């Protein structure tokens, strides 16, 4: 009986999966708040991710992304392109059984955004000089969405998701207005096995 319990426990731990991979997607962004004559602007998302999933269905995804946000302005005659390094930290729940070929999922978590550039449609800098910045260097957001993981072959998964990100902070340093980021994202990634995480020892056993 004791051996059976130990065997089942070891088997469950062995099935807890850690994977990494690249991600690419489309960002569709706009502003909300004290703004007028803005419209949705497409942009690029590219980066990588770290996934952890367990038999219970709960998991975690940490991502490091380059994402283009902003908006079209002046009746679509110009653009504000805000380029961010993003770090979404997403609690994930997978539906279905562990090992199923298709695993639908939902996720929610904070998004740390670090501004690396602000340019107009022609590529001109619109963020002022180092002593007079127009846009804030950091934005905190909330990201939630859903999607599915599809197993292409043993332990190699196609990751697909649709997400919505809402900015929580004013992205400008202007005193007379408050503007926040607002964006949809459609992303595709490919995950490869990294190893097995043992929740009792807190160690990652790589392949």
Can you name each region flagged by the protein language model?
Residues 49-51, 90-94, 139, 147-149, ...:
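Transmembrane beta-barrel domains of outer membrane proteins
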Residues 52-124, 192:
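Gram-negative (and chloroplast) outer-membrane scaffold detector with strong preference
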Residues 12-18, 56-57, 96-103, 152-156, ...:
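Short loop/turn motifs that connect adjacent beta-strands in outer-membrane beta-barrel proteins
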Residues 16-18, 38-44, 81-87, 102, ...:
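Residues that define the transmembrane beta-barrel architecture of outer-membrane proteins
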Residues 31-39, 69-83, 114-139, 172-179:
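Extracellular/periplasm-exposed beta-strand and loop segments of Gram-negative cell-envelope proteins
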Residues 23, 88-92, 182-207:
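Outer-membrane beta-barrel "beta-signal"
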Residues 13-51, 191-193, 205-207:
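Short glycine/proline- and aromatic-enriched beta-strand/turn motifs that initiate or cap beta-hairpins
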Residues 18-24, 60-62, 87, 104-110, ...:
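Transmembrane beta-strands of outer-membrane beta-barrel proteins
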């Amino acid at each position: 009986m004791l051996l059976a319990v130990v065997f089942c426990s070891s088997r469950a731990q062995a099935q807890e999966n850690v994977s990494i991979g690249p991600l690419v997607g489309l960002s569709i962004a706009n502003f909300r708040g004290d703004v007028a004559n803005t419209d949705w602007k497409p942009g690029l998302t590219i980066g990588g991710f770290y996934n952890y999933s367990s038999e219970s269905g709960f998991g975690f995804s940490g991502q490091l992304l380059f994402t283009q946000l902003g908006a079209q302005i002046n009746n679509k005659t110009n653009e504000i392109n805000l380029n961010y390094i993003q770090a979404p930290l997403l609690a994930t729940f997978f539906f279905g059984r562990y090992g199923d070929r298709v695993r639908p999922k939902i996720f929610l978590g904070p998004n740390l955004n670090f501004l690396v550039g602000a340019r107009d449609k022609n590529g001109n800098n619109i963020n002022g000089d180092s002593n007079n910045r127009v846009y804030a260097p950091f934005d905190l957001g909330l990201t939630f969405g859903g999607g599915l993981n599809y197993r292409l072959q043993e332990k190699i998964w196609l990751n697909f998701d649709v997400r919505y990100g809402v900015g929580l902070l004013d992205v400008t340093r202007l005193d007379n207005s408050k503007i926040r980021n607002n964006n949809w994202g459609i992303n595709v990634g490919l995950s490869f096995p990294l190893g097995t995480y043992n929740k009792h020892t807190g160690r990652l056993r790589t392949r």
